Amino acid sequence: MKSGSGGGSPTSLWGLLFLSAALSLWPTSGEICGPGIDIRNDYQQLKRLENCTVIEGYLHILLISKAEDYRSYRFPKLTVITEYLLLFRVAGLESLGDLFPNLTVIRGWKLFYNYALVIFEMTNLKDIGLYNLRNITRGAIRIEKNADLCYLSTVDWSLILDAVSNNYIVGNKPPKECGDLCPGTMEEKPMCEKTTINNEYNYRCWTTNRCQKMCPSTCGKRACTENNECCHPECLGSCSAPDNDTACVACRHYYYAGVCVPACPPNTYRFEGWRCVDRDFCANILSAESSDSEGFVIHDGECMQECPSGFIRNGSQSMYCIPCEGPCPKVCEEEKKTKTIDSVTSAQMLQGCTIFKGNLLINIRRGNNIASELENFMGLIEVVTGYVKIRHSHALVSLSFLKNLRLILGEEQLEGNYSFYVLDNQNLQQLWDWDHRNLTIKAGKMYFAFNPKLCVSEIYRMEEVTGTKGRQSKGDINTRNNGERASCESDVLHFTSTTTSKNRIIITWHRYRPPDYRDLISFTVYYKEAPFKNVTEYDGQDACGSNSWNMVDVDLPPNKDVEPGILLHGLKPWTQYAVYVKAVTLTMVENDHIRGAKSEILYIRTNASVPSIPLDVLSASNSSSQLIVKWNPPSLPNGNLSYYIVRWQRQPQDGYLYRHNYCSKDKIPIRKYADGTIDIEEVTENPKTEVCGGEKGPCCACPKTEAEKQAEKEEAEYRKVFENFLHNSIFVPRPERKRRDVMQVANTTMSSRSRNTTAADTYNITDPEELETEYPFFESRVDNKERTVISNLRPFTLYRIDIHSCNHEAEKLGCSASNFVFARTMPAEGADDIPGPVTWEPRPENSIFLKWPEPENPNGLILMYEIKYGSQVEDQRECVSRQEYRKYGGAKLNRLNPGNYTARIQATSLSGNGSWTDPVFFYVQAKTGYENFIHLIIALPVAVLLIVGGLVIMLYVFHRKRNNSRLGNGVLYASVNPEYFSAADVYVPDEWEVAREKITMSRELGQGSFGMVYEGVAKGVVKDEPETRVAIKTVNEAASMRERIEFLNEASVMKEFNCHHVVRLLGVVSQGQPTLVIMELMTRGDLKSYLRSLRPEMENNPVLAPPSLSKMIQMAGEIADGMAYLNANKFVHRDLAARNCMVAEDFTVKIGDFGMTRDIYETDYYRKGGKGLLPVRWMSPESLKDGVFTTYSDVWSFGVVLWEIATLAEQPYQGLSNEQVLRFVMEGGLLDKPDNCPDMLFELMRMCWQYNPKMRPSFLEIISSIKEEMEPGFREVSFYYSEENKLPEPEELDLEPENMESVPLDPSASSSSLPLPDRHSGHKAENGPGPGVLVLRASFDERQPYAHMNGGRKNERALPLPQSSTC
């Protein structure tokens, strides 16, 4: 039927449409395919997509039960689907990324039950992988019941859809079991960008090697190219060139002649919601249909199938619409010419129709108060071109629901020239109200029979009104069976044969011969389900028209010698039916009773069939080698249920578990076994244990609220409706198959992959390196119960368990399809223990090689091993990955000092850690005396030369200093301890020297570490600048010679820095007094003061708003860039804080000049044990605990600086004393999230505060994660984007704490023994500078305070700790 609201164009029509479109409209080598592509049962049908660029319609891929290798199928041309994408039960498909690598847009022009992307029951799908999918224009996504599907939590759907609230992602693999890893995260070099989902700021990717594409924020809602260049505003999804409306992958609005346009040009029309076509294109669609079809129309600038509501065609051959005068006439047509109305649903198809082309057959057998519904849907019909037949409509009392019917043309008539036929309507009492009704029957006769409640006078009145009086013969309006509820059947019909199958019954009966054979009209067969043989003819009938019997009319055989019969189909297998037959005759006997015939009630059962699948399969593990499985019987046993077949198969481990190196904490994937309680004899609920009402201890589960119950109920109903809709949409009927086909399908999985073996065999299967091993199925038979226990399984291993139902005909028909469940066994205690002894072999250069056997049956899979070894002092740990162990069979320990050692080894599997092995003892020998003698011969001359050279240099420098008349205000310096000074302590003027007359001081800026800091002007210190505003640092007049030399040495540190984000040294005035250091002027002071000035309550607030998120990120990037430069030049800052960052005139933040601001904020430091001042509130746990300072500890301090920025320079750990802060941080405490702090900024802080230093990002990685948020000028001036930023060799980045000298904070620690960290001797170094001062040297005196804080690398330097004159 084609009506105003429904019906689609034939496939041939669309074929012509898409062929012409492919040749003329789309500017690629591909085609526009459609109107919808349905690929089912055979994976080779995928070839239909080979040349498709756009699918104008939907794409179904479903019901492919045989697992295939899809890697050879790739469709890179496909970029757009205009409607929706549906995937359902496709075996073997693991990712969509290879199939559709360039699918970019799903428009959702028409949806599948409100969804544009549906992925349902895809058992092998491991990831979606549509890494180029950028836009789903309309509709939501539904991803459900995909047992192995991961990488769902790593996709930010808000970047693809406008709204994510209607998305439904349920029943997939739990994220904790997936171990989703975005590209580069395992190597700690993440490549993907981060976004926030449900308050979780994380990397976004589609697979382990494909990031989710995000466009720069500067693009707004525009798409972008692969190189992050913004597309033209009319582009959707992506483009091949920036700002080019001819280079779009898809169009935001409409596509025409190779260009994306906001609206269709003149003389073109919108089509299918995405492109523009001309009038001839619409006309070509018309010509493709049959001649009597009205085809497409053009209305309101759109080419569409029919006029919208309120409009009608302007003539039968017109392509244009005009407004209706009053209700619009609407012509409806049934393709089969006859429309059967047997329910409200079928009547609904006629809603709004005024003219019906064809015949109406009304057959409403049951239903209460159905007339109002029929009137809503059929009340506007005015004309029927064919005939109207009303039969067996026991629910009808009147025909008034056809309230506007005024003309029956009778162009097509029933046999006998009938155009109005009313037969066997048990409750029909009235036709129409003829006082207010004009109905014309233009051609044909009327026929009325077997309407016991319809008065003959009502029929005669209709004759007069309709103009048919005189057309009917005497038998057409039978006065004996209309209006008379009497009937008596005197003859008995006898069945002659019955034949049954699983859903059919064929019956025949004796031919009935009434006295006048002409009065035999037909037969009616009545049948119904009858579990018991106690039904009667009148069961289920009432005055309202309810009737429990199904009725089928059987026409008389044309050959009088053939016995009448009927095929009843659509029956249920293995079901007993009651059947009887009644003859419909007009024969009258003398007492005016109707003469007829009927049979006795016959009981007959259909044949058995394959049962439906078992229901509600559950599995739980009660030990490391057993799984308990429980299920419910099938809803349709289709026979006498006899037994069940239980089959199980070990599942291979996920491939990434073999590929990744898990020697990093917090990155080991989590697996859970199938917990729960299933009792073998009786299934009982395991009561939950929760904390209710604030009281601890086990108690009942807290009751759900009414709102929660209602929400769960609605969700369950919605899920059921969706599944029904899904199954009704994709399961289409096909011709009945032969029985051998049914048997073959039912037994395919049961026989082809089974083998005759016992369950015990599964325990001895080895664990090969083959990632996707196909393990065999094992099976057992379960009789007379719905539960079983599977034994002899491997510990902590995932199994697939299939349950098949089998009835008494299983040998012949086969068993049901399977219902399956995945379950994991419990871990076995001791399974991860290393079974044999640990052995060792000596290796050259103070190394040994440890060997040990692998656990035989581990809990799932061994991921790594951990070695704990050491001598008498402290144990060290070494991690050995699975790959390394498989390659070498053990591990090598290098660079061991001579002595006795013990070592123990522990394995880590998917379930956790095993036990430590018994210790193995080994001895590392010292080098032989001969070797020592050789070394001594080599080293002695070198030492003598160094000593002599040092003495010569000292004498030269001393002589030069002595003759320098301008030293120390013209007075010679007499040292109390002349042996203390070395050549390294004396400052030698160099190219940084500036003449004093070029410096002019103007005003004081503040007090520095050594003296006052002034603002001034320097001439010629910056190239191409005659005069430059500078900061001038001085030394107090009362400063000692040591302090003056230290002042100049600290300035010398700055000579090596040349970075935009580090405050620059411009020159030094060391000749004469006072000594001056010329620095870059930072007019806005230190960052701490600047941030506090932005507080609203500050009186000196320069009317500047608090920094926005983008400004905070800009500050963070500038600080990180300066720190990355220091790190690249082997400097460890050790005192990174807001007070030590400076703010320039243009608000650029730079790393400070390492001394200018420290005395101002001396309260930010803490003196531990009476020694040097320490910035404990900015220090990392390892720095507080072991005195280790590395670039990782600088990253921790950087996180605290971010916290200062977010709080406008509040004091960290406010409310805690310095001692409390020290303990709090060493015990793992962290700063709380500041109020109104953006998630992105706080997530960056948390990354910097990882307790394990190795887990913290480097400064370069920090910049990489926020580089898209930085201002464009950052690229021009930063170290990150400079040529100087070259990645060093891996050896150079090895700043591991274990490779560094770890000495307690006590500066008086003896060189002979290392005291515990909390012991303090209270002694000071006898010679040298005051506590807390660190002079940069080539090597450090062990007794020099805080020398150990420089880190443990010879080529790495540390910046000085803060000074204090009070030390």
From Swiss-Prot:
What does the PTM comment of the record read?
A: Autophosphorylated on tyrosine residues in response to ligand binding. Autophosphorylation occurs in trans, i.e. one subunit of the dimeric receptor phosphorylates tyrosine residues on the other subunit. Autophosphorylation occurs in a sequential manner; Tyr-1165 is predominantly phosphorylated first, followed by phosphorylation of Tyr-1161 and Tyr-1166. While every single phosphorylation increases kinase activity, all three tyrosine residues in the kinase activation loop (Tyr-1165, Tyr-1161 and Tyr-1166) have to be phosphorylated for optimal activity.
Q: Which residues are glycosylated?
A: 51, 102, 135, 244, 314, 417, 438, 534, 607, 622, 640, 747, 756, 764, 900, 913
Residues forming the motif IRS1- and SHC1-binding are 977-980
- Occurrences of domain Fibronectin type-III (ranges): 491-609, 610-708, 735-828, 834-927
What tissue specificity does the UniProt entry give? Answer: Found as a hybrid receptor with INSR in muscle, heart, kidney, adipose tissue, skeletal muscle, hepatoma, fibroblasts, spleen and placenta (at protein level). Expressed in a variety of tissues. Overexpressed in tumors, including melanomas, cancers of the colon, pancreas prostate and kidney.
Q: Where does the record put the Glycyl lysine isopeptide (Lys-Gly) (interchain with G-Cter in ubiquitin) cross-link?
A: K1168, K1171
Q: Which residues lie on this side of the membrane: Extracellular?
A: 741-935
| Function noted in UniProt | Receptor tyrosine kinase which mediates actions of insulin-like growth factor 1 (IGF1). Binds IGF1 with high affinity and IGF2 and insulin (INS) with a lower affinity. The activated IGF1R is involved in cell growth and survival control. IGF1R is crucial for tumor transformation and survival of malignant cell. Ligand binding activates the receptor kinase, leading to receptor autophosphorylation, and tyrosines phosphorylation of multiple substrates, that function as signaling adapter proteins including, the insulin-receptor substrates (IRS1/2), Shc and 14-3-3 proteins. When present in a hybrid receptor with INSR, binds IGF1. PubMed:12138094 shows that hybrid receptors composed of IGF1R and INSR isoform Long are activated with a high affinity by IGF1, with low affinity by IGF2 and not significantly activated by insulin, and that hybrid receptors composed of IGF1R and INSR isoform Short are activated by IGF1, IGF2 and insulin.
The protein's name is: Insulin-like growth factor 1 receptor
